[in-house]
Amino acid sequence: MPESLANAVAAAAADQAALRSSQLATIFAETGTLASAIPGYRPRAAQEKMSEAVANAIADNDTVIVEAGTGTGKTYAYLVPAMLWGGKVILSTGTKNLQDQLYLRDIPTVRHALNVPISVSLLKGRANYVCHYHLERAQANGRLASKQDAAWLREISRFAKTTTSGDKAELAEVPENAPVWQIVTSTRDNCLGSECPNYKECFVMRARKEAQQADLVVVNHHLFFADVVLRDTGMAELLPAANTVIFDEAHQLPETATLFFGETLSTSQLLELARDTVAEGLSHARDAVDWVALGAPLERAARDLRLAFGRENARLALGQIDADPRIREPFHETLDALDTALSDFVEALESQAERAEELEQCHRRALELAQRLAAWRDDRIAASPVPAAVPPAADAEGDQSSQSSQSVQPAQLGPETVRWVEVFSHTVQLHRTPLSIAPIFSRQRAGQARAWVFTSATLSVKGNFTHYAAQLGLDRDRSLTLPSPFDYAKQVLLYVPRDMPPPQSPQFTEAVVERALPLIEAAGGRTFLLCTTLRAVQKASDMLYDLFAERGINLPLLVQGQASRTELLDRFRELGNAVLVGSQSFWEGVDVRGEALSLVIIDKLPFAPPDDPVLAARMEVLQKKGLSPFAVHQLPHAVITLKQGAGRLIRSETDRGVLAICDTRLVEKPYGRQIWQSLPPFTRTREADTVIRFLEGLGRGEAPQSESSTESE
């Protein structure tokens, strides 16, 4: 390009950028477009700055990473330029809760304020929509586990006749985690597709069609990556047409992408296959074969694989299994038996598949699972470092079909993968996981020019995006850090107790509860106690039950597992003086504003266990490259996770409270400084009396006081 033409192009681009900046200034001004249309709206400089960065990325088909602190108003900051200039936009969130909030509240608000005629669609995974075919089958079958399930089935049947979306979130009468949903929704494996007699009325297909026609489509990360891998979510037609892709809660992307770019085979899938085949066989070809006898060997082999592991929960690298004779022989023997049973099942089903489309679908599923098992067993490339020990119990079984049927072709995974086994109470999952998703994700982003926006409140370590960008193969220089408008020094006291035992000590959780109890009393409840393991949740809650009874402390105690997360949070807000003890699922995506939450206690720094199979393999690769696994991976990951947990406390300018971190490594280890400097600038203390006075004074509107023992950054 001649220099004169290049200069003209650059000048035109600069003029366009200035025009966009002027438009955004008008929209976000104190008396601007948003303020005129949205009651209570207040301008924030960081919000306008982020909006400009997003607008520029859209204009240049560029990538931008934005860490926007809590209270910045990042949702409006990306929605405004997306609606004005984004073209076809895909907006992906970390949770279905945020997905619903955006679709039902935030997007309509901004669309109305801007007065732009854009169409919006909400697209979820197929497990969120009632399936007419499976609903009819469940009603005809009539075999339900309880009267409650039967009542819920009647509610779902009435709902299916009146709803236009089929989205189970709209049916408040049936809990979203009710077991009955599993039999009235479809999976990728058991969907009949265009051969289904109810295809024209299918809620999933209707949602996908609406998404194809919409200007802005709201999805979640699981759906986005499931499509990238499976082309089975309706996104296959969406992504090529998209001009802009925005990831909110983008800190979750590395973990979600790793899940979907790997391969997983679960015994639950095999049991479901056997049961579906028996049901379809009895329905369409009852006299052809003994269907129960056909499915029995596969069911037995799948259960035997679980019985090969004595422990309830474990995450074991294949190398670790092979190094332990107590597990090695039972595992490989039952795996051989499963391989044989699945092969026999495929062969027997082949001759019956032509009798009905439903049986043909079962045959295709069986073939795919057999191929996946063979690929897992024959992988000679994957390294399987032997971790030091078996990690603590997993947080949840989570063996959902939406997460267990993903598969990337082996060539896509690359040479650096790890094979490992995850054992739950009732199922076993065989995983093959890429140690780096950066090259895979980079390939997915290559090709058609479009804008990519990654945003969250927690993406950096002290403003450095190296760790996050490296995980996804992004350019760390195309990033922006925007601080929260909150006055953290006045709103929050950060407390690290003295004289705590080491985090690995058997007495550690007991010490945490002992230090926490006087703070809980001073706060009048209103507490989150966040633990890094489920084992700690159980021990801490048991101790608190006993101590509350012993000392006559009349505070409601809510514990993870008693009910769904949504139910527990609703009860916590309603009670106003509760203590909630939870693990990983409460570290993020939880918003409790006001006086209901004044104290967040974190038991220890959230370092991933070094005996985790995937982490162990990643650490080995880093060591071979001459890098420090701790500095490059473990520490940045812990910082970002801790920032998420700490972010539960302050959700508005009027919130005030105490963040207690009971891990003295935060102040006693050299790396501790890097961790707390990555947190907002809280006032800090190590004196329990200071904390108790502050908590007792919250009702009097007192701010944290600087003392000789208190530091302010």
PLM feature spans:
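A substrate-engagement module of RecA-like helicase motors
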Residues: 2-37, 87-215, 222-225, 277-282, ...
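Conserved pre-motif I regulatory segment
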Residues: 14-66
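Walker A/P-loop NTP-binding motif
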Residues: 55-56, 75-88, 105-109
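Signature of the SF2 helicase/ATPase Hel1-core->accessory helical subdomain module
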Residues: 84, 100, 188-190, 195-339, ...
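A contiguous, basic/glycine-rich beta-loop/short-helix subdomain that forms a polymer-engagement track
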Residues: 182-217, 228-235, 344-390, 394-398, ...
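Conserved RecA-like P-loop NTPase helicase motor core
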Residues: 485, 497-507, 560-667
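Conserved helicase motor "Helicase C" RecA-like lobe of SF1/SF2 P-loop NTPases
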Residues: 532-561
